[in-house]
Amino acid sequence: MEDKFVILDFETTGCDIFNTPPKELGYFKSKTWYDPIELALIDLSSGMEYHYFIEPHPDFVVKGKSWATEVHGYEPDKFIKRDDLQKWTDVFPEVQRVLTGKTAVAHNAFGFDKIVMEQTCEKYNLMPPLCKWRDTKAEIKKMYPDRKHSQVDVAKWMFDETYEAHSAIEDVRMLSKIFQSINEKPDWIFI
């Protein structure tokens, strides 16, 4: 049976509520990530796009604690006043339906997106979707070791394109192109 793929991207507050000191393994490994504020998915088997702005968990709406605004552009005071925010518990049943039995594809899946999914589900006492995961960042590092591997850089050298990075919906649209390009290449080329 052929795998069905779902392109996925989270944006999170990036707020370090536990004042975790940076670890040698890097920024992403020293954080707690049950703080999604935006999620986008594209189900490649149907072409359907899903895009949610998510009400952050109250733990991450703390006076004096900044978000990763320089990355995604969302300012806490403005974001929490949006009228299109949904609760994770309301969004999750559809996310689970879309992902279950398929392969989630994300750029930095094993260093970020999969962890966000697992920690958020754990925080809300939900079972994560039963799906496989693929990490395009790891795959591109292996396939093109001499190239830059951030998604923005890959879009530039692979397609000579720029896009609105760190908007979850724009990230999944670009990652869909990147993934389909690298997924078409036979494995024997990289032996």
Segments (PLM) and residue ranges:
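Conserved non-catalytic scaffold segment of RNase H-like nuclease domains
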Residues: 2-118, 130, 152-159, 166
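Metal-dependent de-N-acetylase/amidase catalytic core
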Residues: 144-174
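Short alpha-helix plus adjacent loop in nuclease-associated cores
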Residues: 133-149
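Acidic two-metal-ion nuclease catalytic site recognized across multiple nuclease folds
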Residues: 3, 157, 169, 173-191
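Short helix-capping segments at alpha-helix termini
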Residues: 123-129
